[in-house]
Amino acid sequence: MAQPALKVVDMPPVDKDKSKAIDAALSQIERAFGKGSIMRLGKSDKVQEVETVSTGSLGLDIALGVGGLPRGRVIEIYGPESSGKTTLALHTIAEAQKKGGVCAFVDAEHALDPVYARKLGVNLDDLLISQPDTGEQALEITDTLVRSGAIDVLVVDSVAALTPRAEIEGEMGESQPGLQARLMSQALRKLTGSISRSNCMVIFINQIRMKIGVMYGSPETTTGGNALKFYASVRLDIRRISTLKDRDEAIGNQVRVKVVKNKVAPPFKQVEFDIMFGEGVSKVGELIDLGVKAGIVEKSGAWFSYNSQRLGQGRENSKGFLRDNPKIAAEIEGSIRQNSGLVAEKILENAAPTADDLDEGEA
């Protein structure tokens, strides 16, 4: 049986009457809801340009595709315990403060260490902090701060600690399923519009739980239901992959961050970097690793060199050399930024998405 041929129908050009009707509708909408409530996409500079805040990690900024975390969006950072979630959020706050931004930290876990935050570069005098008693109180405070339009970065640590008032007032062991998920869903419905209008970045730190009875696929899931997965523009999965030691003493962790979801650039890139105890993200360690990937730093056996100058034997010695020679470190960083496209390609080569990543990214 012969297949019918596909017929391509050309749309007629927009006539003058249609154009007048569109303009009249646009002006009516703007009178009713305010200027900027509707616009042509190509004429809006705000829509085309994505403002970002650095994460404090050069590799992660490159992996995100736009040079950092986007402002005016919801961000989720999740992972196991002691993997570096709060450290990454505090680095982002420090970078925003360096550019004159106002930041807030909603400490639902009541566990923020101000001494450690100061070591990461956070200006504690200008940081707004709240330690709410209930999940409703935490999200009301978040909503008020976002609506003020004066906050640049706001961190909620963590979603798992946003305990509904009914659960706190109830008996220990009393089952109240779905309370936290409904709380998060309602809060995000309210917050999303305010976040976009105020251009405030809201980072939700989240924990991991295990789903019972899962036979196939990953049994891991995040707390607070599915709403955050859908509303988040960027989701970062951070994992500790090894412990860094100086002889027998642990001095830090090597972590891997995967961009599980990204609405502003291609997702599924991953990057590895060191988080040193009492110091945070090791920038000199990243310069060596990314420099090797970009072909800027040469590695021959155990030796690392840059422009025919030896940096040191072994990675730790090379890190020490760059720490003592900030000018050379700045040169390497500049070269890496100029070759960020090549570095991003190398990062993408090493991070093929899994079936679980694809499921998460579709949210």
UniProtKB/Swiss-Prot annotation:
Cite the entry's keywords alphabetically: ATP-binding, Cytoplasm, DNA damage, DNA recombination, DNA repair, DNA-binding, Nucleotide-binding, SOS response
Lineage runs: Bacteria, Pseudomonadati, Pseudomonadota, Alphaproteobacteria, Hyphomicrobiales
Specify which residues bind ATP according to the UniProt entry for this protein.
79-86
| Chief localisation class | cytoplasm
Which protein are we looking at?
Protein RecA
Q: Which domain of life is it from?
A: Bacteria
Q: Which family does it belong to?
A: Belongs to the RecA family.
Q: Where in the cell is it found?
A: Cytoplasm
GO process annotations (BP): DNA recombination; DNA repair; SOS response
Cited InterPro entries? AAA+_ATPase, DNA_recomb/repair_RecA, DNA_recomb/repair_RecA_CS, P-loop_NTPase, RecA-like_C, RecA-like_N, RecA_ATP-bd, RecA_C_sf
MF (Gene Ontology): ATP binding; ATP hydrolysis activity; ATP-dependent DNA damage sensor activity; damaged DNA binding; single-stranded DNA binding
Question: Its function?
Answer: Can catalyze the hydrolysis of ATP in the presence of single-stranded DNA, the ATP-dependent uptake of single-stranded DNA by duplex DNA, and the ATP-dependent hybridization of homologous single-stranded DNAs. It interacts with LexA causing its activation and leading to its autocatalytic cleavage.
Q: Which GO terms describe its cellular component?
A: cytosol
Checking Pfam families in the record gives: RecA, RecA_C
